[in-house]
UniProtKB/Swiss-Prot annotation:
Span(s) of short sequence motif 'KMSKS' region: 539-543
Protein name as annotated: Valine--tRNA ligase
Family affiliation: Belongs to the class-I aminoacyl-tRNA synthetase family. ValS type 1 subfamily.
Biological process per Gene Ontology, one example term: valyl-tRNA aminoacylation
Motif ('HIGH' region): 46-56
Length: 910
């Protein structure tokens, strides 16, 4: 094993090496018999059709950080991977392929179509999984699941049959979201409401008795052919006398009643609404309440059926135009107004969906939701992070309606119900009896027992909503309904990490299904992350065409850089993040900054390892307290504070804060200061036994601190830290990923010392800045006078004299309580109450320095006067926003301070 690092970090090579090594060695394979508290996460299964987008990268980075931390903490950890069969998405792809070949799925038939679907899955379905591998996710690939694999299919059948036998699944005729493009019912999640510019058409509906008319307004004129009533609000006095009368429906000449219903908004349109119970959710409710007929107008493809009369066979939008023209020709059109309103679109078919009366399978939700609510109210289970999402989840559970679970597709879990078609002359109707069973043999046996030996069966052609199998995901993936070792050890799972957009559709369904079948909520915590927004603050999405390909950034900057950026950008749990990206150059400043951080760590580690004389941290050990110098005790105290802080922040899901804290400690405290402070000891210029001992202690502290840093950072940047740890420890056959996470050594924590050392660092920083401002050559030795009336401050400065001399290139250091009188030809600065002076005689050309400072002073004075003039202008002060005025005052104060400092510098130069 090599004991040195290459001069440059090459992320592509390193990442591929460790991803392969981890997977081939089964480093992340879970064992339920292993000791340790269980920590389990099931992956939110991406669609098998998917490819990696920034949302996946963000979510996976968050999960992997948590999982790697808990594994290193000593927990018995399982991150279970898998993919979702994505019924509509796969079917859409396959039907698009068939269309290009001039075929339809009906031309192939169900069996051949499914063969083709499985073939497509085998050839193309692993894209998203392989891309997740590029992220370095520490999942147990031996447990990878697919929502249509044999075990999960058995779980789906079991769940369906149990719910049916308990009376919680039924077949009924209700309104569903119907997508004419896929010719299937779709879930609410698959519907996206879009604001569109449309029209509001006003039509006359004449009273049958000839005594007048009502004017109704609608955004969908074609549905008037299915009207079976007109409704008004019972408190609307304008129409009180008309309730109970009838109107004659134009074009159809159907007599329909006028009813009073609280659902009617008197302010919408004229306060009269047409009622089409088969094609509108509110109208459906009113139709049931007033016993109105339900007339279905639509075919599955969105064209009008025979109930459309003269418009039968026309597409719904073509029929809309023609119905309006016919009503206008007959004098029933009153007016047309522009109207912006919300239209539901199917997210796959990209066409408006229709509320359609259809016979479907439903799950009764009320009792399932009540159980989930009881867990939330009594035990705060699950615990939402951030807490506010618990209220959103609760509100949704209260408002739940029965869940339509059938889809008119072929790819998916076919509903385990067989119709006894011999009882209805070979046809499937609303009255055909059916048998629910695990397979056809069981169904046939049941049917023969009930209907005789000559029965004929036909399985329901529909498949289950994808969310039905996804709702079983946390426990079906572990072997349910069998009582497996995995289920006993890892269920309920520990944390679910997901976006807020599917709390309603996935999280709630999992809690309801799991609570019903296992008696336990499926996860202890639900960490809701925010959205990934683009450089303009807009949500990244396909429709907005503003997404960034994570693989492009991975190839350019490395996986660790992208992961670290995504996590570091999180201001707090649940907050959105914004990713800076130059689309013309394909560059990201924020990801580049993380790559620079990786390079900084690499270079620091390389320097440390080159100065350890080939020894590992174990071989070196850590010096006892009495041998530690001031800087050693400071960095070890800071290290242990950071260990405690990082552990607490990760435990509380403050991953962004943890990432930022590590960045500041590693780059600032360790790289910029401690390594620099340790260099003179490493180079052992003083020699002798004392010098050699000081060198050894510096090596020990450097090795210990670097080792701890690598471990602390591993969950966030796993690849570079694995490479560094392997080299530092000269390890063979071991992985950093399986080592213990650092724990706090309270005996090394010294807050008072940290405060002292912070003063030293600020003093050194000021000396460096003054040298640079004065133009003193880097190697030139200087005199520094440090003045403070505070005894404790002077004592601290004297304790740090060695560091001030070494880092500040100080030949003559004076720590005094009072400055000598008439200090001239010097440059000065201030640290708290400490005055810092560097005499300049013989070091720089004072005339050049005076001219430089005078130019800066002139510029600052001009800026000061400009701001002052603006603030004295009543027109600006009276009209400008408060924040603009406050900003101007702040700039004025800053300019005043800088001007005074420059004036004092000129005065001191003489």
């Amino acid at each position: 094993m090599t004991t040195s690092l290459p001069p440059q970090y090459e992320p592509t090579v390193t990442e591929a090496k460790w991803q392969t090594a981890w997977e081939e060695s089964h480093a992340f394979k879970a064992d339920p018999d292993r000791p340790g508290e269980p920590y389990c996460v099931v992956i939110p299964p991406p669609n098998v059709t998917g490819s990696l987008h920034m949302g996946h990268a963000f979510e996976s980075s968050l999960i992997d950080t948590l999982v790697r931390y808990h594994r290193m903490r000593g927990d018995n950890t399982l991150w279970l991977p898998g993919t979702d069969h994505a019924s509509i998405a796969v079917q859409t792809i396959l039907e698009r392929q068939l269309k290009a070949e001039g075929k339809t799925r009906d031309d192939l038939g169900r069996e051949k179509f499914l063969e083709r679907a499985w073939q497509w899955k085998a050839e193309s379905g692993s894209t998203i999984v392989n891309q997740l591998r590029r992220l370095g996710v520490s999942v147990d690939w031996t447990r990878e699941r697919f929502t249509m694999d044999e075990g999960l299919s058995q779980a789906v059948k079991t769940a369906f049959i149990k719910l049916y036998e308990e009376g919680l699944i039924y077949r009924g005729n209700y309104l569903v979201n119907w997508c004419p493009a896929s010719q299937s019912a779709v879930s609410d999640l698959e519907v996206e409401n879009q604001e569109v510019d449309g029209h509001l058409w006003y039509f006359r509906y004449p009273l049958t008795d000839g005594s007048g008319e009502l004017v109704v307004a609608t955004t969908r004129p074609e549905t008037m052919l299915g009207d079976t009533g007109v409704a008004v609000n019972p408190h609307d006095e304008r129409y009180a006398a008309m309730v109970g009368k009838t109107i004659t429906l134009p074009l159809v000449n159907r007599e329909i009643p006028i009813v009073a219903d609280e659902l009617v908004d008197p302010e919408f349109g004229t306060g009269c609404v047409k009622v089409t119970p088969a094609h509108d959710p509110n109208d459906f409710v009113m139709g049931q309440r007033h016993n109105l007929p339900f007339i279905n107008l639509l075919n599955k493809d969105g064209s009008l059926n025979e109930n459309g009369g003269d418009f039968a066979g026309q597409d719904r939008f073509e029929a809309r135009k023609n119905v309006v023209q016919a009503l206008e020709a007959q004098g029933f059109l009153v007016k047309i107004e522009p109207y912006r309103h919300s239209v539901p679109y199917g997210d796959r078919g990209k066409v408006p969906v229709e509320p359609l009366l259809s016979t479907q399978w439903f799950v009764k939700i009320e009792s399932l939701a009540q159980n989930a609510l009881a867990c939330l109210d009594e035990d705060n289970s699950p615990n939402f992070v951030p807490e506010r999402w618990g209220k959103v989840y609760r509100d949704w559970l209260v408002k739940l309606k029965d869940w339509c679970i059938s889809r008119q597709l072929w790819w998916g879990h076919q509903i385990p119900a067989w119709y006894v078609i011999s009882e209805t002359n070979g046809a499937i109707t609303d009255h055909t009896p059916f048998i629910v069973a695990y397979d056809e043999a069981e169904a046939l046996a049941k049917a023969k027992a009930e209907y005789g030996p000559t029965v004929q069966l036909q399985q329901d052609p529909d498949v289950l909503d994808t969310w039905f199998s996804s709702g079983l995901w946390p426990f079906s993936t572990m072997g349910w309904p069998e009582q497996t070792d995995d289920l006993a050890k890892y269920y309920p799972t520990s944390t679910l990490v997901t976006g807020f957009d599917i709390i309603f559709f996935w999280v709630a369904r999992m809690t309801m299904m799991a609570g019903h079948f296992t008696g336990q909520i499926p996860f202890k915590d639900v960490y809701i992350h925010g959205l990934v927004r683009d450089e303009n603050g807009k949500k990244m999405s396909k429709s907005a065409n503003n997404g960034i390909d994570p693989l492009l950034l991975i190839n350019k900057y490395g996986t660790d850089a992208l992961r670290y950026t995504l996590i570091r950008e999180v201001a707090g749990a649940g907050q959105d993040i914004s990713l800076q990206y130059d689309r013309q150059k394909d560059e990201s400043e924020s990801v580049e900054a993380s790559r620079n951080f990786a390079n900084k760590l690499w270079n620091a580690a390389r320097f440390v390892m080159m100065n350890l004389d080939g020894q590992t941290p174990q071989q070196l050990g850590l010096a006892p307290g009495e041998d530690l110098e001031l800087a050693d005790r400071w960095i070890l105290s800071r290290l242990n504070q950071v260990i405690q802080q990082t552990r607490e922040q990760i435990e509380d899901y403050g991953l962004g804060e943890a990432a930022k804290g590590l960045y500041e400690f590693i780059w600032g405290d360790f790289c910029d200061w401690y390594i620099e402070l340790a260099k003179p000891r490493l180079w052992n210029k003083e020699g002798g036994d004392v010098g050699t001992q000081r060198q050894l202690v510096a090596r020990q502290v450097l090795a210990h601190t670097l080792d701890s840093i690598i471990k602390l950072l591993h969950p966030f940047m796993p690849h570079i830290t694995e490479e560094l740890w392997q080299t530092l420890h000269q390890a063979e056959g071991q992985f950093l990923a399986l080592q213990a996470y650092p724990t706090v050594n309270q005996s090394l924590v010294d807050p008072a010392l940290e405060t002292q050392f912070a003063l030293l660092i600020e003093t050194l920083r000021t000396i460096r800045n003054l040298r640079a401002e004065a133009g003193i050559k880097p190697g030139a030795m200087v005199t520094v006078i440090l003045q403070s009336e505070n005894d404790q401050e002077r004592q601290t400065l004297q304790l740090g004299e060695t560091y001030i001399r070494d880092i500040g290139k100080v030949e003559n250091l004076q720590v005094v309580s009072q400055l000598p009188p008439e200090q001239t030809q010097a440059i000065a600065g201030v640290v708290d109450t400490i005055q810092v002076l560097i005499p300049l005689s013989g070091l720089v050309d004072l005339d050049i320095l005076r001219n430089k400072i005078q130019k800066t002073l002139d510029k600052v004075t001009k800026e000061y006067e400009s701001i002052e003039k603006r603030l004295s202008n009543p027109g600006f002060v009276n009209k400008a926003p408060e924040e603009v005025i406050a900003g101007a005052k702040e700039s004025l104060n800053a300019a005043a301070v800088q001007r005074q400092m420059l004036q004092e510098r000129l005065k001191m130069l003489g």
